[in-house]
């Protein structure tokens, strides 16, 4: 039994799908015009996705590269047989998506009606075991056997001596360019409908991406390669116009990345914790008095410790510098003082995590990179956000011009 402030994904996986399957079969037992319309409108991605997931079920979850060669290679006869043999399970997976988006659209309409916008995340890469790689292998750097030639990651730095080996397949940008990056255009256009604002993860890979030979033990043998650059964003603007996009431009940032960010017109990100991190030579870029107006400022992202947690887990010298710079005091609350540092800056948008508003410690951090145990499990409890906190937040927003009184 998990504590109430933690999501137990294992239990949900075991208990939720049998119930969902019953609901899906019940929906499929009678005509449903709304479901049919959803399938027709979203068939461009839904058909391959549902087939892929039905095949995963039939293969007991085995990764797609371990399937039999005919279906792994999407041979015509094997695809036809799968569509016939797994027709019901394919339809069930389509119902799951229909139910999700029906609920999501209702939630989004509700919060938009309150004047709230939703920022969604667009991961730069997809998993090797994904419908994208299986259905459109020509878009990725794969060999004749369907294995990645190189995979994604980050080079060694002050935070990791061997770098980060993510393992995702890399895009074949030259091939993608031949049809005007249509796969990417469709992805971005669709997600801009799902969310109000889109944050593109690992923006620097559009300028240069790090390629690590497949099978490497760590990221150290990797090399930087040229990405699609300005041409990608020129085509994006031509096809889709001005879009509400935030660029995650953290990490190893070069002059060419900064130039691409300026040309794209997207605001970049500033992380307050990085301003005081003695391991990071880029600290001055993250100190509030150096912020440009056109940026989005955070105390920390989902990959960082909470504000209160950082005060106890960071190097003592880093914490002392933050205390001096922001005049932090226990009376105000260290976490509240860090938020004040953001709100009083010129950044046009600031983001604080729910955990920081509540003053929670490291036990409530959302994600610890390179670990898999307790990530993305924290959730707030009923009553955590009370009227007293709302009034305090409101006064701060008025004081720093974040809202009008």
Short names for language-model regions:
Residues 1-101, 126-351, 355-356, 361-362, ...:
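Alpha-amylase-like alpha-glycosidases and glucanotransferases acting on alpha-linked glucans and related
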């Amino acid at each position: 039994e998990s504590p109430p402030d933690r999501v137990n994904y294992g239990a949900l996986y075991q208990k939720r799908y049998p119930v969902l399957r019953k609901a899906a079969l019940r929906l499929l037992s009678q005509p449903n015009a709304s479901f049919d319309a959803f399938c027709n409108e979203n068939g461009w991605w839904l058909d391959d996705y549902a087939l892929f997931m039905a095949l995963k079920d039939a293969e007991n979850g085995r990764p797609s590269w371990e399937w039999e060669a005919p279906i792994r290679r999407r041979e015509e006869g094997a695809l036809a047989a799968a569509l016939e043999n797994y027709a019901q399970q394919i339809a069930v997976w389509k119902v799951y998506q229909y139910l999700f988006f029906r609920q999501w659209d209702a939630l989004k309409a509700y919060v938009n009606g309150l004047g709230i916008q939703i920022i969604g995340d667009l991961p730069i890469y997809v998993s090797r075991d994904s419908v994208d790689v299986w259905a459109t292998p020509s878009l990725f750097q794969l060999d004749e056997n369907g294995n990645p030639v190189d995979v994604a990651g980050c080079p060694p730095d002050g935070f990791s001596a061997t770098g980060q080996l993510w393992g995702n397949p890399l895009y074949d940008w030259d091939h993608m360019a031949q049809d005007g990056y249509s796969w990417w255009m469709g992805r971005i256009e669709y997600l801009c409908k799902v969310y109000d604002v889109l944050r593109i993860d690992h923006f620097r890979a559009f300028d240069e991406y790090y390629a690590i030979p497949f099978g490497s033990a760590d990221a150290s043998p990797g090399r930087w390669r040229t990405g699609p650059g300005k041409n990608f964003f020129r085509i994006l603007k031509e096809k889709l116009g001005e879009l509400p996009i935030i660029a995650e431009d953290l990490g190893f940032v070069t002059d060419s990345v900064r130039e691409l960010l300026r040309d794209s017109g997207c605001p970049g990100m500033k992380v307050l914790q990085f301003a005081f991190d003695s391991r990071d030579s880029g600290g001055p870029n993250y100190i509030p008095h150096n912020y440009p107006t056109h940026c989005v400022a955070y105390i920390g992202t989902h990959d960082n410790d909470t504000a209160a947690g950082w005060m106890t887990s960071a190097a003592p010298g880093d914490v002392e510098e933050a205390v001096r710079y922001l005049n932090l005091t226990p009376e105000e609350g260290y976490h509240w003082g860090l938020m004040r540092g953001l709100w009083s800056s010129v950044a046009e948008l600031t983001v604080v995590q729910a955990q920081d508003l509540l003053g929670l410690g490291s036990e409530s951090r959302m994600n610890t990179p390179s670990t898999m145990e307790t990530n993305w499990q924290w959730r707030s409890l009923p009553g955590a956000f009370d009227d007293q906190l709302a009034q305090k937040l409101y006064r701060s927003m008025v004081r720093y011009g974040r809202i009008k009184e």
